[in-house]
């Protein structure tokens, strides 16, 4: 090493060697966050050179970065002039300012080593191929000198690559290790830009056949396929494929948030995050869908939305083959196979597969509902629920069923509806084998086996297996009946009660028996009717073993064993309850006046005389439960 330092034939590493370059096509493939990160890193490199006392030029790249412009130049501009500041000047054989700046001014790593060793000679001897082995070694002290400033380290299996250094040192190391030549801005008419090096060599990825013009770019790209992540965080052990990702990640541990919003004071650890946040204040939505015209604030949301039109689902589960549009959805799904429940509630000990589920659950303990609807003031525990609710006000229903044309405001509702047409019942109970179309119904059914009733009324302590029953029950205490019929003014405490009632006025009978075609107003009537076709008799008399299709028929039959009269003398003059036998509609129509009965014996005679007619009308006429 000492011999290398005293060799008079030396070469300095130029700024072009530590600069990441993009073609116009490559630049177009970067999103806004990646472009912003690129600008920040390159300007940070320049600032580092200045802080070390190194002369830094202001070529076209730096000028574009400082002004937020794209860091590529048109070929027409390159063929006319050359370096910035030379416009209008005749060609000369003398080196230009740009040439001197690039070839002589930036000897960053040479000067960095000089400052550490005190040696006045810079650079390394250059062999016929452009680099010697000693030159690679010559850069090592410069890399090692940055070691203390970095938050991470190299994974042991990648020790040969050196330490996880700053962005500058990493770029230089890539170039030296991969054998790229050092380029200087050495001519005006060559048509080569110091930013875009149009090299004859083309490097192709064997996995995906993507083409790169530099070997280091290919090597960095190949990490995607190989999964190599040489940069490891010393705090949590997480690994990254690039040193820049490690630097960004380290701010999670330090809590550093240097980028502050001037509008609301919110701080961020990345400038790209601040830029995205500022669009909330400005209302800017630069990403517009060409299919439906919908605009988005963030590119990632825009890309995800586009997949709803194309149907693309790039994330496929290796276990079951199910595909997903986005990575978070895939990760959430994969936990189903692993059976892992890593998130535990400290209040009740309940465990969850996802952090979002835990946070949502914890709000049941705190009662916090931070997301409020600006239209109606209704509050929600999570933002997704608010977004889900807000569609009610807009009336938008973009998801239409191709089978029947019915439209829905959420994709999940459409998928759930389509199971009616397909007959799919993916949720099967392991206890009794019963299958269900919807997950919510399946969970509710399982509580019938376990006896779990997690929803408790604070007024009376009564518990329920589902939230809907608790809400319906609570209206008993409040007496509230917000749903009023516009036809007759009758009020109900449930929307479903109003809907069922309105069918009396409209005559609608949406429930049809597939066996005989008979229609009914309510689903309960259809279920009760279906037993006629199936012959099912689930209600059995414990005395004689006789079975009945309805509980009311069993109750009526059991009076034959008990000898209890349908109406006793003491019952006359007060309303009937659900536990008592109701007065038959046939008897009311025939004008039988039970209020004139004076003895219990007379009632028994009345019952015997109408026993036959009761059986005739029992199947066709409903019974009045109260008068």
From Swiss-Prot:
- Could you give a single Gene Ontology term from the biological process aspect? regulation of transcription by RNA polymerase II
Q: Which UniProt keywords apply?
A: DNA-binding, Metal-binding, Nucleus, Repeat, Transcription, Transcription regulation, Zinc, Zinc-finger
Is Metal-binding among the key words of this record?
yes
* Keyword Transcription applies: yes
Give residue ranges of zinc fingers (C2H2-type).
Answer: 203-225, 231-253, 259-281, 287-309, 315-337, 343-365, 371-393, 399-421, 427-449, 455-477, 483-505, 511-533, 539-561
Give the region (Disordered) as residue ranges.
Answer: 71-95, 113-162
Q: Principal localization?
A: nucleus
User: Pfam families per the record?
Assistant: KRAB, zf-C2H2, zf-H2C2_2
What spans are recorded as compositionally biased (Polar residues)? 113-123
Which spans does this entry mark as compositional bias, Basic and acidic residues?
135-160
UniProt name for this protein? Zinc finger protein 805
| Upper lineage | Eukaryota, Metazoa, Chordata, Craniata, Vertebrata
């Amino acid at each position: 090493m000492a011999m290398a330092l005293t060799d008079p034939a030396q070469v300095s590493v130029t700024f072009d060697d530590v600069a990441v370059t993009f073609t116009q096509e490559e630049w177009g493939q970067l999103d806004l966050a990646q472009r912003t990160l690129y600008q920040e890193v390159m300007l940070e490199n320049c600032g580092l050179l200045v802080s070390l006392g190194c002369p830094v030029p202001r070529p076209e790249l730096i000028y574009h970065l400082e002004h937020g412009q794209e860091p590529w130049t048109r070929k027409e501009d390159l063929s006319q002039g050359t370096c910035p500041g030379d416009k209008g000047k005749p060609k000369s054989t003398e080196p230009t300012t740009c040439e001197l700046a690039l070839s002589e001014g930036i000897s960053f790593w040479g000067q960095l080593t000089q400052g550490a060793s005190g040696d006045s000679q810079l650079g390394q001897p250059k062999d016929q191929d452009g680099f010697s082995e000693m030159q690679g070694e010559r850069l090592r002290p410069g890399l090692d000198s940055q070691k203390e400033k970095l938050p991470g380290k190299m994974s042991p299996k990648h020790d040969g690559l050196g330490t996880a250094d700053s962005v500058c040192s990493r770029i230089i190391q890539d170039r030296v290790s991969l054998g790229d030549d050092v380029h200087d801005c050495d001519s005006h008419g060559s048509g080569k830009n110091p930013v875009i090096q149009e090299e004859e060599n083309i490097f192709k990825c064997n996995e995906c056949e993507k083409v790169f013009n530099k070997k280091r770019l290919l090597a960095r790209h190949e990490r995607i396929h190989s999964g190599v992540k040489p940069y490891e965080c010393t705090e949590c052990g997480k690994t990254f494929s690039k040193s820049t990702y490690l630097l960004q990640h380290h701010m999670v541990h330090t809590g550093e948030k240097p980028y502050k919003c001037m509008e609301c004071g919110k701080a961020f650890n990345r400038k790209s995050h601040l830029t995205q946040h500022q669009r909330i204040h400005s209302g800017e939505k630069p990403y517009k869908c060409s299919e439906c015209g919908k605009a988005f604030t963030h590119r990632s949301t825009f890309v995800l939305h586009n997949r709803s039109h194309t149907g693309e689902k790039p994330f496929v589960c290796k276990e079951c083959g199910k595909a997903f549009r986005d990575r978070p959805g895939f990760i959430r799904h994969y936990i189903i196979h692993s059976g892992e429940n890593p998130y535990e509630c400290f209040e009740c000990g309940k465990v969850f597969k996802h952090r979002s589920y835990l946070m949502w659950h914890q709000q049941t303990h705190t009662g916090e509902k931070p997301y409020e609807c600006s239209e109606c003031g209704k509050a929600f525990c999570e933002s997704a629920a608010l977004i889900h609710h807000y569609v009610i006000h807009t009336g938008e229903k973009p998801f239409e069923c191709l089978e029947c044309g019915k439209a829905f405001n959420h994709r999940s509702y459409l998928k759930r509806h389509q199971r009616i047409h397909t007959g799919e019942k993916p949720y099967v109970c392991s206890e009794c084998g019963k299958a269900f179309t919807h997950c919510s119904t399946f969970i509710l059914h399982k509580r019938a086996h376990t006896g779990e009733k997690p929803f408790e009324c604070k007024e009376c302590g009564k518990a329920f297996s589902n939230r809907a029953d608790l809400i319906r029950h609570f209206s008993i205490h409040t007496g509230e009946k917000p749903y009023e019929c516009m036809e007759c003014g009758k009020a109900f405490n449930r929307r479903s009660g109003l809907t069922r009632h309105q069918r009396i006025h409209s005559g609608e009978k949406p429930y049809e028996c597939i066996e005989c075609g008979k229609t009914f107003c309510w689903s309960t009537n259809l279920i009760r009717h279906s037993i006629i076709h199936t012959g099912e008799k689930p209600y059995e008399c414990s005395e004689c073993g006789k079975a009945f299709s309805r509980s009311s028929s069993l109750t009526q039959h059991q009076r034959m064993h008990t000898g209890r009269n349908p109406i006793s003398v003491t019952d006359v003059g007060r309303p009937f309850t659900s536990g008592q036998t109701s007065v038959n509609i046939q008897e009311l129509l025939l004008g039988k006046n039970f209020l004139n009965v004076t003895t219990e014996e007379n009632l028994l005679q009345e019952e015997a005389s109408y026993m036959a007619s009761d059986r005739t009308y029992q199947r066709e006429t409903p019974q009045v439960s109260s008068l």
